[in-house]
Design a protein with these regions (language model features):
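Intrinsic disorder/low-complexity polar-acidic segments
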Residues: 90-239
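Feature for intrinsically disordered/low-complexity regulatory segments and propeptides
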Residues: 1-91, 100
């Protein structure tokens, strides 16, 4: 299992890969960004090549360069507008200051191509009579590479690596919003979308609670799976 973690910080339990800087759960978004090693920006630079000794600029393309080490993160189009890490983490300010969330994890994946921030929501719900606690988080994924949009969503998954980020982003699109890089990051538009998504998150909680209270006999489960994944005669003969 590849974690693809470049740098990160976390509050709470140590991630499965053991990487990152452990922090208190009362950091501001800006403090979390700095401890996680994300206090850098990205800039678009012209791409040139030498042809018969003459320097020629490649039209329509820009190199996306990280300010901290001049690393080229990707090649993007002229119209591609980056979202700076500082702007991404500033988005968490309103929620953290209101007291409903605390910064929980943040980091850089794939050598800086993807940056994420995760805030833990104070509210949680329990299943199976309180035996299983399900936490809720607000995730912001900020890719610095072509072909991926900025994604902000609610998720029950604690993001600590590329795998858990992928699992979160594969969740229901209705729990958040995805923005392309053709325009500036619109924080107000995202907040409005999250207001609607929070209602759907409540529905998710109710459905999970309902299913957790259902009990089935083993024979019923076999019958159910046999209907969903029927075993053919040929396959049955080889089992």
């Amino acid at each position: 299992m590849a974690h693809m973690v470049e740098t990160m910080a976390y509050a709470g339990e140590v991630p499965w890969h053991g990487l990152g800087v452990k922090v208190a759960d009362d950091l501001t978004p800006q403090e979390m960004m700095k401890v996680a090693g994300l206090d850098w920006s990205v800039e678009r630079h012209p791409i040139t090549t030498l042809v018969d000794g003459e320097e020629i600029t490649i039209e329509g393309k820009k190199a996306l360069v990280r300010s901290s080490d001049n690393k080229v993160l990707d090649v993007v189009g002229d119209q591609w507008i980056p979202v700076q890490n500082a702007d991404a983490f500033e988005f968490f300010d309103e929620y953290v200051k209101a007291g409903g969330m605390t910064m929980h994890t943040a980091g850089s994946l794939k050598d800086g191509q993807i940056v994420w921030g995760l805030a833990k929501i104070d509210e949680y719900f329990s299943l199976f009579g309180g035996k299983d606690q399900v936490d809720s988080y607000l995730l912001l994924s900020n890719p610095h590479n072509y072909g991926r949009g900025v994604d902000v969503r609610f998720t029950p998954i604690r993001v600590v690596c590329n795998n858990t980020l992928s699992m979160s982003l594969e969740g229901k699109a209705s729990l958040g919003i995805s923005l392309n890089h053709k325009s500036e990051f619109n924080a107000e538009r995202v907040r409005l979308a999250l207001d609607e998504a929070s209602k759907k998150m409540e529905t998710y909680h109710e459905m999970a609670d309902f299913l957790s209270k259902k009990y089935y006999k083993q024979a019923d489960l076999f019958e159910y799976f046999n209907q969903v994944f029927p075993v053919t005669t040929n396959r049955a003969g080889t089992m």
